[in-house]
A protein has these predicted regions:
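Alpha/beta enzyme core
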Residues: 4-12, 16, 27-52, 59-74, ...
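Short active-site oxyanion
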Residues: 19-21, 77-78
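Short, N-terminal intrinsically disordered low-complexity segments that are rich in Pro/Gly
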Residues: 20-27, 52-55, 258
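Glycine-rich beta-to-alpha transition loops that act as phosphate-gripper elements at the mouths
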Residues: 25, 79-85, 201-213
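Extended, intrinsically disordered, low-complexity segments
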Residues: 243-283
Length: 283
């Protein structure tokens, strides 16, 4: 089926108490693996690319690959720009065929974050495309965006931010970090409930790679409607390729490397879709 926007997908999740898995993809193999996993579980799914991935492969290339693979399936597939770092990139993604975009102004102060987000929302409304924004700082490193320390999202600021920008979804900081965790993360899960009480748009959890199933499920129960996974998919992909080359160093066919990588990513995505509770929720 054609690509769909994230709006109905996330509103359905909010209404029915589950989250949509959103998976960062780096190449054709990862695109095929994520969609195959979602199709097997009859789950809605979001595929995401970051600015560095877009620089590597271009917006148009990824849009073309995802559109072609989505056309073969009956499940809802959305293509999302993750951590869009400028107004210009967000607009370029819309023009290239992305059906959802994020503008990340969380490194700005509150007023400037509102200003850049509102600017993107105004254009996105003309395209009929939903916008995700971020308030508070998620730790770790995502491409060239780095937080020196976690600053969790304030519920009242979140309420004002959503009202003034008109965003369709909001990524909130509760103690997660991008990349894998060195120690055990301490998540402020009650904060999710507090934000949900005053914000009426779907909430997004970034930095879910490496979180326990218990943590993810509780965050979803408290109101997270979209959960992002990136690092663990990269690791699954790379480890599978390394393993094949260690066992069969004579291998030189990229397709053989791609097959084992796709299987590893698919297995990881299946587990995460079930963790989010969106298996069987394709509409």
């Amino acid at each position: 089926m054609p690509l769909v926007t994230s709006e109905k997908m996330l509103l359905d999740a909010k209404k029915d108490g589950y989250a949509v898995g959103a998976f960062n993809v780096e190449n054709m193999e990862m695109v095929k693996a994520v969609i195959a996993a979602a199709e097997e579980l009859n789950a809605p799914v979001m595929l995401q690319t970051t600015p560095s991935t877009v620089k590597y492969g271009t917006l148009e290339t990824f849009a073309g690959i995802v559109k072609a693979e989505a056309a073969k399936t009956k499940i809802p597939v959305c293509l999302h720009l993750d951590h869009g770092n400028s107004f210009e990139l967000a607009v370029q993604a819309m023009k290239a065929g992305y059906t959802s975009v994020m503008i990340d102004g969380s490194h700005e102060d509150f007023e400037n974050n509102i200003a850049v987000t509102k600017k993107v929302v105004d254009v996105a409304n003309a395209f009929g495309i939903p916008v995700e924004a971020e308030l508070g700082k998620v730790g770790g490193k995502e491409d060239d965006l780095e937080a020196d320390a976690d600053t969790n999202t304030d519920p009242q600021e979140a309420k004002e931010f959503v009202e003034r920008t008109g965003v369709s979804s909001l990524a909130v900081a509760i103690g997660t970090a991008h990349g894998f965790y060195v120690g055990t993360p301490v998540l402020d899960k009650p904060r999710v409930s507090a934000i949900k009480e005053v914000v009426d748009v779907p909430l997004v959890l970034h930095g879910a790679s490496g979180l326990s199933e218990e943590d993810v499920r509780e965050c979803v129960e408290r109101g997270m409607c979209k959960v992002n996974f990136a690092t663990e998919l990269r690791v699954a992909y790379t480890d599978a390729v390394k393993k094949l080359l260690e066992e069969k160093p004579e291998t030189f066919d990229p397709k053989k490397l791609g097959v084992v990588a796709m299987e590893a990513v698919k297995e990881q995505v299946i587990a995460r879709i079930k963790m989010c509770g969106c298996d069987g929720k394709a509409k």
